[in-house]
Amino acid sequence: MSNATNNTLGSLLPQLEAAANSNSLYGGMVPNLRFNITMIVIWGILLTIHVVQLLMRQYWFSIAFICTGILEVLGFIGRTWSHSNVADMDAFLLNMICLTIAPVFTMGGIYYQLAKLIEVYGHRFSLLPSPMAYSFIFICSDIVSLVVQAVGGGLCGVAVTDGTSTTTGNHVFIAGLAIQVASMAIFLMLWFHFLFRIYISVRWEHINSRPISLSLLKISQTEVDYLYREKFHFLRLEPKRWVFHYFNLAITVAVLTIFTRCCYRLAELVVGWDGYLITHEWYFIILDALMMAIATVTLTIFHPGFAFKGRSTSIPITPGHVDPETLPHTDDVEDILDTSDSKQFDIEKEEFQASMKYPISTFKQFMSKIANLFSSKKKAKL
């Protein structure tokens, strides 16, 4: 087995010990065959749709959603496999690893959409100085979360080898999930702050008053659009563009459902591997499988490629602290924000690579150090 598999196996040892009497890795519960096959079909359809959307719209960050689809399909294949043999370690690990990691990719895509929306509405609505900072900070946070979970798994593995308690490793593993939940909670606050600024604050600015009243709803988006960034008014005002008009609501639904799922996973581990949550599949069906399905179906209907007009419109994320609205020369702005159709895919690809370069290199360094640490301990024992 690889180091990653060994680490993950180590983190699951408390469950193995608790379920030893029933010879089941699911605490005595047997995954429902019909449900898990149904989920394989549903996720297979969603995965196919996102691949087609990527090819049609050339929207580079669709790859994040495709990765989620692949992991979900593999995860439910693992659960289907486990139905016939609940003691099969390979099937159990395929399920646990894939379904645990899958939401990270969806959230990575969502972080990037906030940066795009800040460019569409204007930098003044952003709490952070740079739109790309949202992607950078929260993608790094998710990677740190995965690293901490790997460390927890490694500690459990070493503890079992030494014949000591796995409690510390299990606590570290739970801490990794807690970091993910805390990171998403912070992102939710920043997201709702952004929504407050573009929907409430602009109306206060428009009427030069700050009433807290339903009368604000009578002010249409068209009336306040002059307070947004002029360059992308065509995205916001075109009457037939219902996908963009409801895009912010779609992102909100997706984030809240994924956040619910992550809270469930954290509670599941806190209660224990042999606890009530993990041994009753209905909790998994409603709070994990259904939540992820709702999030992905929502992002499939309100796909960013449709919301931002795919390759026909370029919305590059402004680097650093530069606000294009404050640049003195229009020509300079156009040079920085080149909207030629032929460059859209390359721009998206470069931004994706730029946002992931440092987080991935940091993740590799962490994992290398962890592998060396546990490898040296094993050699010392020999």
Curated annotation (Swiss-Prot):
GO MF terms, alphabetically ordered: long-chain fatty acid transmembrane transporter activity
Record topological domains on the Extracellular side: 1-34, 79-90, 157-171, 263-281
Induction: In response to loss of mitochondrial DNA in a transcription factor PDR3-dependent manner. Induced in response to altered glycerophospholipid asymmetry of the plasma membrane in a transcription factor PDR1-dependent manner.
Transmembrane segment boundaries: 35-55, 58-78, 91-111, 136-156, 172-192, 242-262, 282-302
Keyword Hydrolase found: no
Mutagenesis / variant outcome for changing residue 3 to Q: Increases sensitivity towards LCBs
Topology with respect to the bilayer: Multi-pass membrane protein
A Pfam family the protein falls into: RTA1
Glycan attachment points: 3, 6
Cell compartment(s), UniProt: Cell membrane
GO cellular component, one term: membrane
Record key words, sorted: Cell membrane, Glycoprotein, Lipid transport, Membrane, Transmembrane, Transmembrane helix, Transport
Main location: membrane
Cytoplasmic side: 56-57, 112-135, 193-241, 303-382
Annotated consequence of substituting residue 6 to Q: Increases sensitivity towards LCBs
InterPro entries for this protein: RTA1 (IPR007568)
UniProt family annotation: Belongs to the lipid-translocating exporter (LTE) (TC 9.A.26.1) family.
Official protein name in the record: Sphingoid long-chain base transporter RSB1
Organism: Saccharomyces cerevisiae (strain ATCC 204508 / S288c) (Baker's yeast)
Protein's gene: RSB1
